Amino acid sequence: MKRARFVVLGSGAASPAPERALPAHYFEYEGVGALLDCGEGTQFQLMKAKISFSRIKVVFVSHLHGDHVLGLPGLLQTMAMASRRDELLVIGPKGLKDFLLSSFELTYFYPPYPIKVVEVLRDAEITYRNLKLKVFPVNHTVPAFGVSVETASKRKVRADVLEREGLPKRLWGRLQRGEDVVWEGRVFKYEDFTFEGERIKVVYSGDTAPCERLVEEAEGADLLVHEATFTKELKEEAHDRGHSTAEDAATAAARAGVKQLLMVHFSARYKDLRRHLEEARRVFPRSYAAEDLTKVVILK
């Protein structure tokens, strides 16, 4: 059985609030962790969630507004103080590399471990070990991206069929690797005798107003993590500022046919999220409002 976990480290928006940290989220599958955005204070939230910094192999920055990125230089320095030696993959928009290099230079920081920065201009698909990250543009006031994180899937053999056909088990592994097998003059095509195992798919919106591309990329996801900065009476303001309402998030979830919606990125003006939930559940019943350190475990 596949098991992944998603942890909301910071459920707030641009203005900090005592009860809500700035945007940051963590996805982990088979020991490989991906940090999705890194607002100020993310280090403290990781410690509260008991997530080891060394488990973070990939960092995705959705855009360069401060509430999504200003926690990253400090986190990278703390990783160095913890004697990190593993490479860290950092993915984000154009300008992220200059931002990091400037912060390193001005704070006299010389990373003792390799940091690979991949800047995305439009679309990108990046595979890291057992994770496939698909980065796509969303609808914000500055260049901004959402991301689909999908677990790798190993092909599985149709054991009952292969046993009936008499193919020796020692050859099954080749079919699993996507190779055709010739045995006793017969060709066994891998696509006829194997099938794709189930994948776990989580999609994170970053900051966005309603976005058709996001709906397309979220299709069938196990979890859609979507910003819901405002409720619908502030819909016009939300869209003008490149943000979504709870109703917008639920509409995206319903159209994409996702299994669950987790709303995040709440304006500091909201102390009570009941209106967000009521608004969203009228459109998509499986809607939830995140608190800091909310954890979702996905099993398949």
From Swiss-Prot:
Active site: D67
Catalysed reactions listed for this entry: Endonucleolytic cleavage of RNA, removing extra 3' nucleotides from tRNA precursor, generating 3' termini of tRNAs. A 3'-hydroxy group is left at the tRNA terminus and a 5'-phosphoryl group is left at the trailer molecule
Enzyme class: hydrolase
Cofactor binding note from Swiss-Prot or TrEMBL: Binds 2 Zn(2+) ions.
The entry's keywords: Endonuclease, Hydrolase, Metal-binding, Nuclease, tRNA processing, Zinc
Its EC number(s): 3.1.26.11
GO molecular function: 3'-tRNA processing endoribonuclease activity; zinc ion binding
InterPro entries noted in UniProt: Metallo-B-lactamas, RibonucZ/Hydroxyglut_hydro, RNase_Z/BN
Binding site for Zn(2+) 1: H63, H65, H140, D207
Keyword Cell cycle included in the entry's annotation: no
UniProt cross-references to CDD domains, sorted A to Z: RNaseZ_ZiPD-like_MBL-fold
Cofactors demanded by this protein: Zn(2+)
Residues that, per the record, bind Zn(2+) 2: D67, H68, D207, H265
Keyword presence, Zinc: yes
Pfam families in the record: Lactamase_B_2 (PF12706)
Quaternary state and interactors: Homodimer.
Function in brief: Zinc phosphodiesterase, which displays some tRNA 3'-processing endonuclease activity. Probably involved in tRNA maturation, by removing a 3'-trailer from precursor tRNA.
Family under the similarity heading: Belongs to the RNase Z family.
Protein name: Ribonuclease Z
Lineage start: Archaea, Thermoproteota, Thermoprotei, Desulfurococcales, Desulfurococcaceae
